[in-house]
Amino acid sequence: IVQHQLYWVIHIIKIEYMCEQKMNGKIKNQTILCILDGWGISKVTKGNAVKLAKTPNFDYLLYNFPNANLITYGPSVGLPKNQVGNSEVGHMNLGAGRKVQMDLPRISQAFSNNFLAENKILNSSIANINKRNGAIHIIGLCSDGGVHSHEDHIFELIKYLKKNNLRVLLHMILDGRDTSPKNSLNNMKKIKFLFGDLDFIASISGRYFAMDRDQRWDRTEKFYRTIVYREGEKFDDPETFIKKQYSKEINDEFVKPSVSINYSGIDYKRDGVIFMNFRSDRMRQISHALCDENFNNFFTYSKPI
């Protein structure tokens, strides 16, 4: 597909060039911005589709026209050092025409600047939930991928909530797409190291179900019914549960929504929910299901939280 696109780009340039010459007798400077998402530059050939493919049109452009390389990761595009880039980051920086500080480092900086202690809305909610003897449900992609969320932000929030004597329930969404396919055990090891146990993990779901953004509401409903009504497979130990999924060749992304045997669901009168993805597109459907009074994409028994 890319080769065909480049083929036509070259021919369009030639046609426009000839038409311009005939009409005005002059050549006007013209520019076409053609973004090839995922087309990287590397000398490594193993597993490198770009390097291994026959790319005569692309090679023609490189050989016949001036070119330069752009750094698309890390501080050059407003990300932390060595943090991989992604399409949103690339498009944002290209569109702005300058380096744009992205959400990931901005939020990390806010955490280090005592943001939580100074957040009046958060602390008011904490006080109210404590009075009602309720719990905070944290919903987010527990991943170090840095595209939709970052586990460090989730961990910092959990530390703060526990410090304020709040009962925390983590609805752990697994990645496997912006990370390696089987990375969730490493995420759980970090949780156990920081907090001593995994007992507060209330549910586990692959992002395929929890983070759909294309109105495939059957997926969102599975996740919703798990975290609200405790439906789905039950687990006792999260690590054992994940190992069982791997033994069935189910990677993180596609783990079906499942729930802890000790979890009792969401109490709409006492509990609160915090969504931890900083990129909103894949949290929109589940947040509407939980919070929107006019939600009607699938049946919900309870009032919005």
What role is predicted for each listed range?
Residues 179, 184-268, 281-286, 291-303:
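Long, well-ordered, tryptophan-enriched scaffold segments
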Residues 270-272:
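Short, surface-exposed beta-edge/turn micro-motifs
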Residues 2-3:
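Ser/Thr/Pro/Gly-rich low-complexity, intrinsically disordered segments
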Residues 30-37, 274-277:
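Short, hydrophobic/glycine-enriched beta-strand segments
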Residues 19-32, 40-208, 218, 305:
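Active-site nucleophile/metal-coordination loop of metallo-enzymes that catalyze phosphate/sulfate
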